[in-house]
Amino acid sequence: MTYPNLLDRFLTYVKVNTRSDEHSTTTPSTQSQVDFATNVLIPEMKRVGLQNVYYLPNGFAIGTLPANDPSLTRKIGFISHMDTADFNAEGVNPQVIENYDGGVIELGNSGFKLDPADFKSLEKYPGQTLITTDGTTLLGADDKSGIAEIMTAIEYLTAHPEIKHCEIRVGFGPDEEIGVGANKFDAEDFDVDFAYTVDGGPLGELQYETFSAAGAELHFQGRNVHPGTAKGQMVNALQLAIDFHNQLPENDRPELTEGYQGFYHLMDVTGSVEEARASYIIRDFEKDAFEARKASMQSIADKMNAELGSYRVTLNLTDQYYNMKEVIEKDMTPITIAKAVMEDLGITPIIEPIRGGTDGSKISFMGIPTPNIFAGGENMHGRFEYVSLQTMERAVDTIIGIVAYKG
């Protein structure tokens, strides 16, 4: 189905810079997200028909569409995030390519282009309307496509009371891209049986498995002396960092793994001979493998300290989120419903693990099973990001189908 306000709504949203900041100590991490929620989203939530609309100190804008059929007793939530990834988001100037011809798309005057030879996903979209960047920013389809789709579904249901639906709760939240947005999510206030994050990629994505994730911060304490008289005295902290890294499995890196394979990912190294720091992220799907990865890093640190004869390697491990499959597989109702709705719409469900996490990873462990459904974005987090309007329309269809489902 086509929705006349969907495209303009999306274009309005992406032009607002809501980039999050991992170094911030506030919630949300940037004032622009507060402004977007209070000045743009909340007024529109009220206009499209949501009731009891409010903004929480945790950065979430919340609203409710009451059920219009007493036989539909479920309460279902839909959640999308306001922030965009760590890439230029100032001055987003989307291009709308109608009836895409399957060829190369020049991204404004930037010199960058979307070429099917480089981005095979384009082969799915001839004849469709694509929204791209101008090559100087990201687009923000992750996850403003999700926000636009949820808002459009509510607007349509309000205008069509003949479509009977259950109670719907909507939540638009901050800071998903920096991994802290759902930390303060109020599951008791949201009060639904289950929810969906509308934060996936291409048509048909339906996901209930994520990585389990941890961060590792390492400090290496060296001893700097003049290199000319260094023998037997110098301890080079940078060399310690190299030695630590070289003891990790060389093939367990993001660029060499896929599917259900986990990894260690070196994110940052800074320092000097005297002192160095390294940051890693650790990812795996199975709980035992995840715990083993953390234990392996600790073992390497302990071994190095023993060999050095002093405590020069310090490791701090922090769990970030866990594989939501552990929660959702106890009751697969949200997956069963979404799968049935997609199939009724002629959409082939793509049920694969997410090699990442969503807000649903944390919310599921707060007591609300929250799988993820497609929002349409491709090549997210950079200048080559784009989305199909037709896929966004199908996401709206899917949301409407889920809340009207009678099975």
Curated annotation (Swiss-Prot):
Belongs to the peptidase M20B family. Its main location: cytoplasm. Its cofactor is Zn(2+). The active site is at residues 83, 176. Zn(2+) 2 binds at residues 142, 177, 381. Signal peptide: none annotated. Cleaves the N-terminal amino acid of tripeptides. One of its GO terms (molecular function) is tripeptide aminopeptidase activity. PANTHER family: PEPTIDASE T (PTHR42994:SF1). It comes from Streptococcus pneumoniae (strain P1031). It catalyses: Release of the N-terminal residue from a tripeptide. Zn(2+) 1 binds at residues 81, 142, 199. Binds 2 Zn(2+) ions per subunit. Keywords: Aminopeptidase, Cytoplasm, Hydrolase, Metal-binding, Metalloprotease, Protease, Zinc. Its EC number is 3.4.11.4. Gene3D superfamilies: 3.30.70.360, Zn peptidases. Pfam families: M20_dimer (PF07687), Peptidase_M20 (PF01546). The keyword Transmembrane helix does not apply. InterPro entries: ArgE/DapE_CS, Bact_exopeptidase_dim_dom, Peptidase_M20, Peptidase_M20_dimer, Peptidase_M20B. GO terms for cellular component: cytosol. This is Peptidase T. It is found in: Cytoplasm. HAMAP family: Aminopeptidase_M20. GO terms for biological process: peptide catabolic process; proteolysis.
